[in-house]
Amino acid sequence: MATTKPYRVLLYYMYTTIENPEEFAAEHLAFCNSLELKGRILVAKEGINGTCSGTVEQTEKYMEAMNNDPRFDGIVFKIDEADGHAFKKMHVRPRPELVTLRLEDDINPHEITGKYLEPKDFYEAMKQEDTVIIDARNDYEFDLGHFKGAIKPDIESFRELPDWIRENKEILEGKKILTYCTGGIRCEKFSGWLVREGYEDVSQLHGGIVTYGKDPEVQGELWDGQCYVFDERIAVPVNQKEHVIVGKDHFTGEPCERYVNCSNPECNKKILCSEENEAKYLRACSHECRVSPRNRYVIQHELTEEQVAAALEKIEAEK
């Protein structure tokens, strides 16, 4: 019998009315701290979006309290077992939006959104020829893993997606549109925006990639790579049948699923690289970042000017 791990990570969201997000955030933070949870929760007038970790007992108490609050009636928690906390601290922050689209005329998913497809239906729809699959996440999320045949919008943040669609509308014309994201929250708005733009056949993966990977029937099939998550785990598996690595090392192009942030704090770009290349390239995405006086790798490892110069010389010699 499989042993249960001592911790859990909860992923959830709900579009619901929260009258005073600032007041709610302060009270909710105190509540989460009383349970000794750690995580990141965003609160807006339009609802709540959170990931938090704790022991089985702590997370049970949290879910029970949320389920007993009429504002969160019907909320769905996606649960991962874990060996420890997935966060260092607990943050609950009020925001103007749960996901940042910054539309002049905002989308209310209760009023307009794409058709919900359960994992099995989404799986079948992906195999149809007249279908286009749009990844509603950012480029670095796509690079770690995505559905086979999915289109990668060239965007660094969610708010860039509507403009990208308008600039590439010929891809979607006359097609059935499928869209997906990590847990479903971005697609609720994005698919609604597509419907408002006049696209008639728009569907979204209900519960997102996380739900798809746990579904006992599809078992994550047609997914390549891993799923990027916004906590200390960074990546979680999806496809239970086969593991295909799609990520490529920033420096060598070799298969890689290990993300680090560029050591120049002014850049902070997410790059895939091996431990070996992290050391070789001083965890910096470019020469400019390597020679930054604020290079965090150099500071962290207390490298001397001579050691940095030798590393730069070696990189130059191998070009």
Swiss-Prot record:
Cysteine pairings via disulfide bonds: none
Name the PROSITE patterns for this protein.
RHODANESE_3
Q: Which EC class is this protein assigned? A: oxidoreductase
Where is each Rhodanese domain found?
Answer: 127-221
InterPro entries linked to this entry: Rhodanese-like_dom, Rhodanese-like_dom_sf, Rhodanese_C, TrhO, TRHO_N
Catalytic reaction annotation: uridine(34) in tRNA + AH2 + O2 = 5-hydroxyuridine(34) in tRNA + A + H2O
Active site per UniProt? 181 (cysteine persulfide intermediate)
Sorted UniProt keywords: Oxidoreductase, tRNA processing
Q: Extract the Gene3D superfamilies matched here.
A: 3.30.70.100, Rhodanese-like domain (3.40.250.10)
What EC number(s) does the entry state?
1.14.-.-
Molecular function per GO: oxidoreductase activity, acting on paired donors, with incorporation or reduction of molecular oxygen
- Annotated Pfam families: Rhodanese, Rhodanese_C, UPF0176_N
Record-level GO BP terms: tRNA modification
Q: Which HAMAP family match?
A: TrhO (MF_00469)
- What family does the Swiss-Prot or TrEMBL record give for this protein? Belongs to the TrhO family.
Functional description taken from the UniProt entry: Catalyzes oxygen-dependent 5-hydroxyuridine (ho5U) modification at position 34 in tRNAs.
Name of the protein: tRNA uridine(34) hydroxylase
Q: Which organism is it from?
A: Bacillus cereus (strain Q1)
